[in-house]
A protein has these predicted regions:
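Conserved C-terminal helix/tail region of periplasmic/extracytoplasmic solute-binding proteins
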Residues: 269, 273-307
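Pocket-lining segment of extracytoplasmic ligand-binding domains
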Residues: 145-234
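Small-molecule pocket liners
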Residues: 81-87, 185-189, 193-194, 268
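Short, hydrophobic alpha-helical packing/hinge segments within bilobed ligand-binding/sensory domains
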Residues: 42-46, 143-149, 164-165, 246
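Short, glycine-/small- and polar/acidic-enriched structural segments
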Residues: 1-139, 156-160, 175-183
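Secondary-structure end/capping motifs
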Residues: 199-280
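Short glycine-centered helix-capping/turn motifs at secondary-structure transition points
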Residues: 22-23, 50, 153, 252, ...
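Short polybasic/polar patches that bind polyanions
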Residues: 26, 67, 122, 169, ...
Length: 307
């Protein structure tokens, strides 16, 4: 078996757990080693140094490093194409406009989740600085910490992913639905162009394992819930109903054929461009290498999983 080191960023990259625990790497001749690496730069440096062969996540930094250091990180596949966040807030908050002059919890200032928060405010005509919305940073992409800050009224609100909307309703917090936001996020399979060029068969086998795991996730609910319960009960302090809610919401977003959409790519690029204008010299499609996925798709492999 070929040993492959993966890095994943956070506990809501649920398809990664199924890829690992479901035995899909072994099925395609791979020994998958899965490393939890919350820090963005640590994950990316590990990929560039060869410590990791693939990473799941890292959506802003590859554009910056392409400009600043000439690094050649590429994206191979995208599991989900829209960001399913909700605003979890204290009961007196009824809209984003009510957050003027208030505190909100944010994950990783200057990084992807916080850039999305800024875009959410821009979409309704607000500006974090001008409208005196104070961002309180939560380190290490710790969504449970952000949630507890709202619950304990340290902040007025936080933009949260499922299942924290479910927990919020049970705990008496306000959950405000937001418009669907096409976005590259979460389980994005990335490597370097050098590794892909030198290891084409391995890349194809990783993609086979990846799409097979997505198929399993969407069609084998009972076993997938068992895997998620094992991984998330302690990590995110979740109970059975919350995990089932997370499962249902995740299935809605997963792509059977994990191609990115142009709208999701554009939105990621644009919100990164606002924060880091230097990336304007890069075409947003420059980082995407989909020929491996297309080859797998045209072979009939993905369609065959769903027959």
């Amino acid at each position: 078996m070929i040993r492959i080191n993966f890095a994943y960023r956070h506990s809501l990259q649920t398809a990664v757990f199924v890829l690992n625990e479901g035995g899909f790497c072994r099925k395609y001749g791979l020994e998958g080693i899965f490393n939890h690496v919350p820090n963005t730069q640590e994950a990316e440096d590990g990929l560039l140094e060869g410590k990791y062969n693939f990473i799941f996540g890292n959506h802003v930094e590859p554009y910056l490093d392409r400009v600043r250091r000439g690094e050649k990180i590429i994206y191979l596949a995208q599991a989900s194409n829209y960001w399913p966040d909700r605003l979890v807030a204290n009961p007196e908050i009824n809209s984003l406009e009510d957050l003027k002059g208030k505190k909100i919890a944010v994950l990783a200032k200057g990084d992807h989740p916080e850039l999305i928060v800024r875009q959410r405010f821009r979409d309704v005509g607000l500006d974090i600085e001008k409208d005196k919305i104070e961002e309180v940073e939560v380190e290490k992409i710790n969504m449970m910490k952000a949630y507890k800050m709202v619950l304990e009224r340290e902040v007025s609100a936080a933009f949260m992913l499922p299942p924290f909307d479910y927990k919020a309703k049970k705990d008496g917090l306000k959950v405000i639905e937001l418009s669907p936001f096409p976005q590259i996020w979460g389980v994005t399979l990335a490597t370097t162009s050098d590794f892909a060029d030198k290891n084409e068969e391995t890349v194809m086998n990783v993609l086979k394992a990846f799409v097979d795991a997505i198929h399993y996730f969407t069609t084998e609910k009972k076993r997938t819930l068992e895997i998620l319960s094992k991984e998330l009960t302690d990590a995110l302090e979740l109970e059975g109903d919350a995990i089932e809610h997370l499962y249902k919401e995740t299935v809605k977003t997963l792509e059977k054929k994990p191609y990115p959409t142009l709208e999701a790519i554009r939105n990621l690029y644009n919100l990164t461009l606002v924060a880091y204008p230097e990336i304007k010299v890069i075409n947003p499609l420059m980082l995407w290498d989909l020929h491996f996925l297309r080859r797998l798709d045209e072979s009939g492999f993905i369609d065959g999983l769903y027959k």
